[in-house]
Curated annotation (Swiss-Prot):
Binding site for NAD(+): G217, Y218, G219, N220, V221, G222, Y223
Organism ancestry: Archaea, Thermoproteota, Thermoprotei, Desulfurococcales, Desulfurococcaceae
Broad class of the protein's primary localization: cytoplasm
Cross-referenced InterPro entries: Aminoacid_DH-like_N_sf (IPR046346), Glu/Leu/Phe/Val/Trp_DH (IPR006095), Glu/Leu/Phe/Val/Trp_DH_C (IPR006096), Glu/Leu/Phe/Val/Trp_DH_dimer (IPR006097), Glu/Leu/Phe/Val_DH_AS (IPR033524), Glu_DH (IPR014362), NAD(P)-bd_dom_sf (IPR036291), NAD_bind_Glu_DH (IPR033922)
Active site: K105
Protein name in the entry: Glutamate dehydrogenase
Localization in the cell: Cytoplasm
Amino acid sequence: MQPTDPLEEARAQLRRAVDLLGYDDYVYEVLANPDRVLQVRVTIKMDDGTVKTFLGWRSQHNSALGPYKGGVRYHPNVTMNEVIALSMWMTWKNSLAGLPYGGGKGGVRVNPKILSPRELELLSRKYFESISDIVGVDQDIPAPDVYTDPQVMSWFLDEYNRVKRGQFFGVVTGKPVELGGLNARIVSTGYGVAVSTRVAAEKFLGGLEGRTVAVQGYGNVGYYAAKFLAEMGAKIVAVSDSRGGIYDPEGIDPEEALKVKRSTGTVANYQRGKKISTMEILELPVDILVPAAIEEVITDENADRIKAKIISEGANGPTTTAAEKILVKKGVLVLPDILANAGGVIMSHIEWVNNRMGGWITDEEALKKLEQKMVENTKTVITYWEKNLKPEENSLRDAAYMIAVERVFRAMKLRGWI
């Protein structure tokens, strides 16, 4: 199966939402393209004295609801189309979450794993200096993404403050605690997945207690989703990472599985249960499936064999459009990525507000705010789906996109843009 062009996929999803809402074609034409895309050349001197150039981008899709917001990724396969698509998805994610943000995304085509610490810092500073004219506390607020972390955000912050000759701590989120970040940021996406899943389980499965869960992907999102779902009463029976997985119907301890992964390199070395592949985990007889690894793992080739009643998308784009049509017919409920994994950007908003007010907030207070937002958003999408769509024909993703696109459209209309 050929991977889908992410921009084609993003535009197809937008087209479907516009058609379901009954909007004119011009709405699609306006929203199918970003407000602007800046391409930059990042040239640095390597440790061995050679000079290398890397391409980078910042896409600003739409700011009708507020400043652009979205992460920056470092990856050898980043393309401009991917960055544009991701910025579009951030517009819908922020809109659906009820946050005062538009959508933005950045990327640099580089393999950060082969850079020295000095090279990584230089690359980060040069990239952020190159985009400094279009980002800002009230303009565009980047955050961590693939292979970027709080240290990279610290370099971004410092470089921006050097260029702008001020102290603008809200220009990026996902920072270390010492620079105005929040400890709760690391758990936020996984916790949000767990909360959204709990709301859906209470509505459609009679609750989470004793419900079996399989988690594909055991990085930050997968681990914390498993940890919090277990604390909420679910039984984790399978976990996997890129090197394999483990299935034990008697239950798996999420924290023990993490220790095994850290000490041996993979959760597949967990002391009990049956070893499985990272794709086999998708087809296990469980109540809830959490794909939290990579995109396009649930396809029209395996959708028929999926036995879960609820799929909660911890990863971005794990379910293809063709697969979702099959799942809808089977009656499988898919909590879409723009709903289920919005915990990270919601926590980023809490951090941003805190930075702007010069205030402070405890981790417990931050997680409580996040929980309230995730519960509210999940209930809103489910209610809209039941009230305005046909569950046997339409997915929760349809409902989520319709809500998100309608909010952006109304904001643009009110502001006189269209």
